Amino acid sequence: MLKRLIVIAMTATLAAGMSYADQSKAKVTIPVNKTAATSGKQMYANYCASCHGVNGKGDGPAAAALKMPPTDLTVLSKNNNGKFPDAHIVAVLQYGAEIPSHGSAEMPVWGPILGKMDKANPELKQIRISNLSRYLETLQAK
């Protein structure tokens, strides 16, 4: 009888531990409000400013919660010999990247998210990404 109780207790403990482990790995999905595909400024305000800040300096209200400070988006050109790295920015937005300042890739990969907004017109995803990149270019320090 005692052996049976021990087996039951161990099984219950193991099941509880597995259940807890599954919960800690659960991903949280946050709905994204749809913005105009032509407005890089609106997309930036809705999707980027919470971490990167209104002016792109990396000082948004959510920045303190990240493992590493967000990238200062105003110095992208400066850090690329004075030329805005459009192709790199488009690739990061589309596919994500291992960016040291993001720690464990905390920045969302926006390509799939933006693509879901206009399933009937997949071209709009690229238009959105391109317009967001163009807006980031306007934030560059002079």
Where on the chain are the PLM-derived regions?
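Positively charged n-region of N-terminal signal peptides that target proteins for export
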Residues: 1-5
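Bacterial N-terminal signal peptides
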Residues: 7-16
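Periplasmic/extracellular electron-transfer cofactor-ligation site
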Residues: 41-68, 94-105, 138-142
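A structural signal for alpha-helical segments
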Residues: 32-35, 39, 61, 120, ...
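Extracytoplasmic electron-transfer domains, predominantly the class I c-type cytochrome c fold
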Residues: 67-127, 132-136
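Electrostatic cytochrome c docking/interface patches
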Residues: 21-43, 81
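Secondary-structure boundary/capping motif
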Residues: 35-39, 132-137
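Mature, folded catalytic cores of secreted/periplasmic enzymes
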Residues: 19, 32, 51, 61, ...
